[in-house]
């Protein structure tokens, strides 16, 4: 299988609140992420191109609600989500988090 990702992806296990509205009422887990998107392990489904919202705690910025778009749905497994319209500050914070996980995974 040819890898189509534009950004390095890291494995993780991060509890997360997400949902179809900014209230982010669902509680699941992110199992991998990059500055471009993430995989949410969940039994909830959502069709591709559905807008979702993900509540993150980024660096010293506190809580952020990030908007994403479902790219694929693995039934009863999870959702591949692409982040949409990240601010430059959010991109930098995600890159710092990716670098942290990359460093930890190579040790």
Residue spans for each PLM region:
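Short, charged beta-turn/beta-strand-edge "cap" motif at the junction between a beta-strand
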Residues: 57-61
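C-terminal structural segments of small proteins and small subunits
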Residues: 73-101
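N-terminal helix initiation/capping motif
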Residues: 1-33, 95, 99-107
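Short beta-strand-centered aromatic/proline hotspots
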Residues: 28-29, 66-71
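Short strand-loop-strand
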Residues: 12-48, 53, 78-80
């Amino acid at each position: 299988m040819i890898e189509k990702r534009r950004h390095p992806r890291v494995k993780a296990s991060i509890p997360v609140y997400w949902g179809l509205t900014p209230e982010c009422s669902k509680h699941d887990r992110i199992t991998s992420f990059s500055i471009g998107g993430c995989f949410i392990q969940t039994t909830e489904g959502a069709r591709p191109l559905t807008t979702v919202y993900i509540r993150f705690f980024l660096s010293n910025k506190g809580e952020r609600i990030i908007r994403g778009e479902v790219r694929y749905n693995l039934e009863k497994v999870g959702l591949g989500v692409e982040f949409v319209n990240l601010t430059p500050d959010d991109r930098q914070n995600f890159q710092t988090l990716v670098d942290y996980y990359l460093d930890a995974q190579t040790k």
